[in-house]
């Protein structure tokens, strides 16, 4: 595996292998006062973010540093991108400096694929990891979500996973649908008609407008943020109506199965898609998702950058 651009880049065995590797990193680091491994010593990793990020960027940086890599952060707002430099020239510059991997977030769907073609023609050059491209894909988020589900429930195959919210603009939902369906979960999308993707009837999912009917027997309920920054018009009448119909209220949380878990890729809009208290409830796995993000991204960097003879 040279790049990680989309969940479709991975076979089922490769997905399971990354989940297992992330669990191994967690086990190795647990209880260590100094969280440092020599695995990527001498490697140089650039994070190149054209959009804001807290969880993804900081967890990739932490993952690289815990593996002894040199991690250099590039923000579009403070780089030559601000002067009009193209994605191609930015990528080639980082490659010429000596990048072993470039982790990129970009507002344009397909940008990660383009960058990989620019910097690694014929497979020679740095690895590219997609940290989110427009509303297209966010493969590392789907992998850490799957890791969290497996840790909480012991399995993924046969589970009913209900994803609620802005499915139209979400790159997270696309990656999760690809991954969870590959691993044998039943995936149901719940959203108002205006926030379901075009062509969703061809996806390996069911879709519904009725949240209460679908979450009653769900094993996992994943709430999505309403991405107002990607909306040009009115997709629903009001925030209050949206919260009433599609928010995870205390009443809805109380009606879930005892074993059901609640997830959210973040950032959360408390009081809109999820109740303030529900966000902190024991069955809510949000902070576990965040901590798993570091271990999963360590596993990804290990697979792409460390080399075939490397050991943890």
From Swiss-Prot:
The record's keywords, sorted A to Z, are: Pyrimidine biosynthesis, Transferase
Instruction: Copy the pathway line from the protein's UniProt record.
Output: Pyrimidine metabolism; UMP biosynthesis via de novo pathway; (S)-dihydroorotate from bicarbonate: step 2/3
Q: Where does carbamoyl phosphate bind?
A: 55-56, 105, 138, 141, 266-267
- A Pfam family in this protein? OTCace_N
The enzyme's first-digit EC class, named in words, is transferase
Q: Which reaction does it catalyse?
A: carbamoyl phosphate + L-aspartate = N-carbamoyl-L-aspartate + phosphate + H(+)
Q: What biological-process GO terms show up in the record? A: 'de novo' pyrimidine nucleobase biosynthetic process; 'de novo' UMP biosynthetic process; amino acid metabolic process
Question: What EC designation does it have?
Answer: 2.1.3.2
Positions of L-aspartate binding: 83, 171, 225
GO molecular function, a single term: amino acid binding
Q: Does the keyword Transferase apply?
A: yes
Tree of life domain: Bacteria
Matching PROSITE patterns, A to Z?
CARBAMOYLTRANSFERASE
- What GO terms fall under cellular component here? cytosol
Ranges in coiled-coil conformation: none
Q: How does it assemble?
A: Heterododecamer (2C3:3R2) of six catalytic PyrB chains organized as two trimers (C3), and six regulatory PyrI chains organized as three dimers (R2).
User: Its biological function?
Assistant: Catalyzes the condensation of carbamoyl phosphate and aspartate to form carbamoyl aspartate and inorganic phosphate, the committed step in the de novo pyrimidine nucleotide biosynthesis pathway.
Family that this chain belongs to? Belongs to the aspartate/ornithine carbamoyltransferase superfamily. ATCase family.
- Can you say what this protein is called? Aspartate carbamoyltransferase catalytic subunit
């Amino acid at each position: 595996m040279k790049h990680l651009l989309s969940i479709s880049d991975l076979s089922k065995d490769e997905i399971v292998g990354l989940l297992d590797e992330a669990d191994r990193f967690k086990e190795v680091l647990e209880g260590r006062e100094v969280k440092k491994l020599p695995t990527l010593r001498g490697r140089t990793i650039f994070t190149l973010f054209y959009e804001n990020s807290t969880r993804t960027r900081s967890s990739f940086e932490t993952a690289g540093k815990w593996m002894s890599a040199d991690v250099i952060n590039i923000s579009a707002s403070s780089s030559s991108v601000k002067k009009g430099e193209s994605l191609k020239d930015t990528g080639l510059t980082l490659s010429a400096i000596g990048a072993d991997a470039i982790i990129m977030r970009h507002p344009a769907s397909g940008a990660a694929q383009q960058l990989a073609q620019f910097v690694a023609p014929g497979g020679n050059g740095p690895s590219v990891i997609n940290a989110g491209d427009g509303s297209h894909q966010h493969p590392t988020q789907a992998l850490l979500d799957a890791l969290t589900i497996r840790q909480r429930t012991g399995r993924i195959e046969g589970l009913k996973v209900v994803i609620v919210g802005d499915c139209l603009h979400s790159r997270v939902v696309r990656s999760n649908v690809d991954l969870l369906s590959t691993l044998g979960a039943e995936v149901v999308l719940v959203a108002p008609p205006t926030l379901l993707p075009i062509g969703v009837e061809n996806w390996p999912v069911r879709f519904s407008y009725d949240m209460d009917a679908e979450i009653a027997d769900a094993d996992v309920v994943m709430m999505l943020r309403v991405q107002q920054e990607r909306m040009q018009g009115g997709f629903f009448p009001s925030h209050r109506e949206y919260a009433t119909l599609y928010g995870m209220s205390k009443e809805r949380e109380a009606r879930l199965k005892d074993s059901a878990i609640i997830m959210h890729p973040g950032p959360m809009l408390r009081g809109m898609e999820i109740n303030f208290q529900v966000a902190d409830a024991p069955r809510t796995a949000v902070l576990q998702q965040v901590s798993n993000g570091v271990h999963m991204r360590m596993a990804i960097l290990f697979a792409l950058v460390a080399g075939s003879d490397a050991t943890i």
